[in-house]
């Protein structure tokens, strides 16, 4: 079974700490604790992983982000990626080739990811049972430290 991990971006970005940073690869842009922990989890358990951004859509680690932004799924914003553009990226970035997508985000991502899935695909949300970011951070840390993946949750 071919799997990919999708991790959330995060509100805190490199330009919030270093305004002079200029353009940066996506894997260096996002600084929030949840993003850092999900990235560590993705790098530990998956050979393929992407970041999902409400502005840029699906990002590979080496894709360049040029400037700060404040756009989130679930909050209307003129700069939010359209469903059509996200669907196009889903195909262009070959996410259709995966059988299982492991989404390390909260329930708001179901509305974004699930409509993109093809019949052969399943989306797993291992953080869904956790009530709050603190519990999510703890679970992710323990999973990485023990090298045991979080149980699947559909």
Task: Label each residue range with its predicted role.
Residues 1-154:
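Peripheral peptide segments
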């Amino acid at each position: 079974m071919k799997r990919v991990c999708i991790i959330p971006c995060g509100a805190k970005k490199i330009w919030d700490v270093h305004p002079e940073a200029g353009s940066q690869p996506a894997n260096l842009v996002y600084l929030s604790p949840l993003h850092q922990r999900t990235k560590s989890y993705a790098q530990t358990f998956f050979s393929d992983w992407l970041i999902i951004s409400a502005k840029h859509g699906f990002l590979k680690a080496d894709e360049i982000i040029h400037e700060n932004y404040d756009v989130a799924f679930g909050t209307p914003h003129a700069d939010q990626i359209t469903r059509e553009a996200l669907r196009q990226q889903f195909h262009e970035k070959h996410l259709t080739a995966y059988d299982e997508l492991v989404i390390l985000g909260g329930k708001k991502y179901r509305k974004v990811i699930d409509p993109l899935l093809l019949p052969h695909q399943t989306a797993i949300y291992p953080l869904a049972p956790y009530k709050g970011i603190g519990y999510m951070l703890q679970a992710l840390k323990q999973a990485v430290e023990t090298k045991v993946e979080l149980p699947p949750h559909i």
